[in-house]
Structure formats: C-alpha cells, structure tokens
Regions:
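Short glycine/serine/threonine-rich phosphate/pyrophosphate-binding segments
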Residues: 12-26, 88-89, 137-140, 167-168, ...
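Glycine-rich phosphate/nucleotide-binding loop
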Residues: 34-42, 123-215
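Conserved small/polar residues in nucleotide/adenosyl-binding loops
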Residues: 236-238
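Acidic/polar active-site rim loop that often engages polyanionic ligands
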Residues: 34-48, 73-76
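Glycine-rich oxoanion-binding loops at beta->alpha junctions
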Residues: 1-9, 49-52, 110-123, 155-158
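N-terminal glycine-rich phosphate/adenylate-binding segment common to multiple enzyme folds
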Residues: 1-38
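Glycine-rich phosphate/diphosphate-binding loop of Rossmann-like nucleotide-binding domains
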Residues: 53-108
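Active-site rim loops that border cofactor/substrate pockets in soluble metabolic enzymes
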Residues: 88-148
Length: 238
C-alpha cells in the first residue's frame, strides 16, 4: 500500500492501522444523532504534538483543512470542554486577531461560547469539534456505533485522513469494528479529498496560519509548558 501511494498508483488508501509520524493525526467525520448533522472530529488517531494544548491548536488547523476540502467554505470551530480547552481557545483567538480566518461556533447552552459540552456533541453544533485524539477516538466510536448498541460502527466516515504540515500521503483510518457503511463512507471521504486537492488546501491553510503568527504562539506555549514540566520533575524523589 505504501509503495502504491509513493509511486502514484493510487491517490489514497483506507486501512485499519498506519504508522503516522509525530505531527500527523487524523480528522474523523461523523453523523450526529440529534439532528443528523455531519461533524468533523479533530482529531481521532495519531499525535499532533507531545504537548496536549499545542496538539489541540494544530488539530484545529487540520480540521479546517478537512472541512474546507469537503466543501465547507467557512467551517465553524468548537473546542470540546476537556483539559486544555481554555488555553486552546486563548491561542486560537490570538491567531484570529492576527488575521487567521477562523469562525467560532456558539454552544447550544444558554451561556454560549466556543467551548462545547456534551449536548453540542450530540447536536453537531460546530462543523469541527476540536479535542485531543484519545477523546476524539472515543467520540467517533460512540457516535458511529450508537445505533447498534456498540456492536459495530454503522454510520459515518471513519477516523479520517492523516493531516500534517508537509505530509502528502492520503491514508484514511477505519477500525476493526467499522461496518460496510463506514468503509463506504471512508472511501467517499477520500474521493472528496482527492477531487478537491486536499494537499493544496493544506499548503494554503498552513501558510495563512504562519502569516498570522502560528509559530510565535506555539513557541510561547512551549515556553509556558517548561516551568510546569520542571515543577513536576522536582516532585519526583529517587
């Protein structure tokens, strides 16, 4: 499969497992149960960064790339209420203030805001739900297999393509529990990404994010993370 992708025999592939490098992770696509809305889940497998918050910032860009390539010109972004959500929100809003084109969703809860809760997951409030890959993986499993009581995944498009800066192999991930409808969905998802030139969309999106100061924001995040890591190490007694 890897040889066929490398030499251009195939434009994309659907598989259960793939060793994505650090910095590349997958953007899932589900059908939410309350209103039947499609929602991209950024991200579901792989590791965007060793730092959780940096990873969620990158996941947002990966999700925007997938959504735009699939025809959503101005996708809305929501951040799932998990550890690091507020720091991610702050960084993304700084990116937005610097000129990066990002539209935040409003939670269905009365207090609104772009940090999403459980009801927003079920209703598909944002076009893109940003989270860490472990939580995103669970979300896809639950939403895809809800109708079967968890016995197999019957709806949606699987765990999605691996996306990362400079990465140009279209590999779509499904699981052992993915039923025929999900496999078919993953193939349709891949075809859409190929036809609409996902790698060109990715280049443009990364360029826009860099122009808006993505590197500076990520560097500041790394600097902020160092004291916390040092403090944790100081508590370890050998």
């Amino acid at each position: 499969m890897e040889e066929m992708l490398a030499n251009g025999e195939v434009d994309g592939a659907v598989t259960m497992h793939f060793p994505f490098p650090i910095g590349v992770s997958t953007v899932g696509r589900v059908v939410t149960p309350a209103k039947g809305r499609e929602m991209f889940v950024a991200n579901t497998t792989g590791t965007s960064s060793a730092d959780r918050i940096e990873g969620m910032i990158k996941n947002t860009i990966y999700g925007i790339i997938a959504a735009k390539t699939c025809g959503i010109a101005n996708p809305t972004v929501g951040i799932l209420n998990v550890d690091g959500a507020r720091q991610t929100e702050k960084a993304l809003k700084e990116l937005q203030e610097n000129g990066y084109d990002i539209t935040f969703a409003e939670s269905a809860r009365a207090d609104g805001g772009c940090v999403m809760r459980g009801n927003d997951v079920l209703q598909g409030t944002p076009d893109i739900m940003v989270t860490d890959s472990l939580t995103g993986n669970i979300m896809v499993k639950m939403l895809s297999s809800a109708a079967t009581g968890g016995s197999f995944e019957a709806t949606g498009y699987g765990y999605g393509p691996g996306i990362g800066e400079g990465y140009e192999q279209l590999v779509m991930i499904v699981s052992r529990a993915s039923g025929a409808p999900v496999i078919a969905g993953a193939i349709r998802y891949a075809a859409q990404l190929v036809r609409n030139k996902v790698f060109e969309v990715a280049k443009a999106e990364f360029a826009a994010a860099k122009k808006a100061g993505l590197k500076k924001i990520l560097d500041a995040r790394k600097a902020a993370a160092k004291p916390a890591a040092a403090e944790e190490l100081s508590l370890i007694h050998i």
